[in-house]
Amino acid sequence: MSERYSHIIQALGQSTFDKIQTCKILVVGAGGIGCELLKNLVLTGFKNIDIIDLDTIDISNLNRQFLFRKQHIGMSKAKIAKESVMKYNEQVNITAHHGDVKSSEFGSEFFKQFDLVMNALDNISARRHVNRLCLSVDVPMIESGTAGYLGQVSVIRKGKTECFECQPIAVPKQFAVCTIRTNPSAPIHCIVWAKMLFGKLFGPKDDDGGGDSSSLTDLDNNIIHGTEELGNIKRDEQLLIEKEKGFKRWVFHKIFHTDIETLIHMPDLWKDKQPPTSLKLDEILSSKEVSQAEEEGDQLIFKLPDQKQWTFKENVEVFLDCLEKLKQQFDQSNSKPMTWDKDDELALSFVCSASNIRSKIFGIPMKSRFDVKSMAGNIIPAIATTNAVIGGLIVMEAIKVVDGRFDQCLSTYLYQLPSGKRLLMPTQLEPQNPKCFVCNRSFIICRLNTEKTTISQFIDHVLKKSLAVNEPILTVGNDIIYEGGDQDLSKEEIEQRSKIEKKTLATHRLTNDTSLVVEDYNQDFQITITIQHTTDFDEDTKKLKKQQQKEKDQKEGKTTTIEKEEDDKFFEIIGKTSQTTTTTTTTTTTTESDNNSNNNKNNNNNNDVEEDDGFMFIEDQPSSTTTSSATPSISKKRKEIDTNESEDLDSSKKLKSNLQD
């Protein structure tokens, strides 16, 4: 044993190594970061390790989760990770748990036994849960994550640093479908549109991506959705000519010329902005265009092929080629509907090229294939080397914690490109946020209509979705009015609870200025909520506010945009760390999540991100973007990295991330 770890003892000293050997570690998550972390822990000398992971191994994991092989597909990640990592040292004591970390068996009593918890998770819900449990039993935790080429490691300790929930959690932003179809203003709008086009051309008749996709001939309709009343639009005779020349020319002319001309003839859309420009295919194909390599020169040295942005002409050529090949596949399968898949190279190239062409039409910056993949699937591509770097940084911080050198612990951020001469940026740990409702157990206020909001709505949207309470127990005074969880309830009690859920808050004495105590025993969590009755979120009130906003915008010459989440909002929380907004590829009629299929099959509660990378938040001003590198700032507001709004990183500014395994 001493010979195996002689280099570790020489570097750290015998005393520190003895602490490493005797401490007990919990690793939550055995995916991309988890595999690297487990290997590093064993090679460093950690002997007593527990692993928790609910997921099973999918073929898509094998390119980066190196502890798994093809023969392991369908098996427990935690158990196979244990078997594989023990080949490095058979004398380590590893216990694998194939289960959900949020289940009652992994409560506060379970967490008490560990000296340190390491998160290698891929979703916010589980992160919040582990954060609360570690705070409740005063066990230090190391939080980590990656997002493509970006990564972060940070140490959390009760009473000494900010917790995971001290900073705002990004919430998805939704786009109105009319914005996507008629008035795009950002790359994500064009990417969602391109996915909708794929569904319309090749998807099932009721494809979520494209709405009405009853047949390919639907594209021959010369009036786009929402403009049927514009009778002054002339029929495009060239469309018929292009149709005679072939399918791909017809589609191109229809969506990039005919439909754009229709939009141009809607002057109200373009009062305060430049109208789109319709395209003519022959003019584009005959043009000469400077390549990106000639424009950027040495800057391309740091870019991989998928990161290089195609020229406009290249996008057109790729679009036509993909369209032809997809049509052939569609015909050869007897018109069997296709589903867009981020890992299908042809389908991805189609969406990338189509979205970039549309971006060019509307004067929006085009994106690389790498960025489009990240945004189109609302995922962050997994990069094995990033996971490896973060896995190493976790162990470096773990050694400090175990050795009692907590004052030396740091948050370290991994950048995509050198900042100065550094890819790694260490910073001091942030102190507690005094307004955090988790680690400071503060009170919060919830404003809603108590006469219309049901107990079920309050639990699902306010407690579970917004406050991440899994199994709430609601108490008013000395009376328990609701108890979550099914473990100890009889069938009759469950039926009775179902009846309670359908009743409004007011019928249970939850009226204006009522003090409600919410507990979750599994999280060892408690919070007091002051209920305030308001009609601000009633439909009539919201309609009035919209009308007033519209009139105000018209006077100021602005375009009124009402986001769907504002339409659906029925409550407001005051006193909780405010939320930032991130964009997801969703519309008022569709949800474009396209989660990793393995994540869906195995119920690991991923939040629309590819399994290894997860959520990465930056300390920056709130932004409505999607995922990639972004310019960090010293301000303490976290946002989800937008792979679509890629910007340069500045060494004087600080990244903050929470990602996934």
Curated annotation (Swiss-Prot):
Oxidoreductase among keywords: no
Amino acids binding ATP: 29-34, 53, 61-64, 77, 122-127
Top enzyme class: transferase
Alphabetic keyword roster: ATP-binding, Metal-binding, Nucleotide-binding, Nucleus, Transferase, Ubl conjugation pathway, Zinc
Function: The dimeric enzyme acts as an E1 ligase for sumo. It mediates ATP-dependent activation of sumo and formation of a thioester with a conserved cysteine residue on sae2.
Quaternary structure (record): Heterodimer of sae1 and sae2. The complex binds sumo via sae2.
Family according to the record: Belongs to the ubiquitin-activating E1 family.
Designated name of the protein: SUMO-activating enzyme subunit 2
Species annotation: Dictyostelium discoideum (Social amoeba)
Taxonomic classification: Eukaryota, Amoebozoa, Evosea, Eumycetozoa, Dictyostelia
Recorded name of the encoding gene: uba2
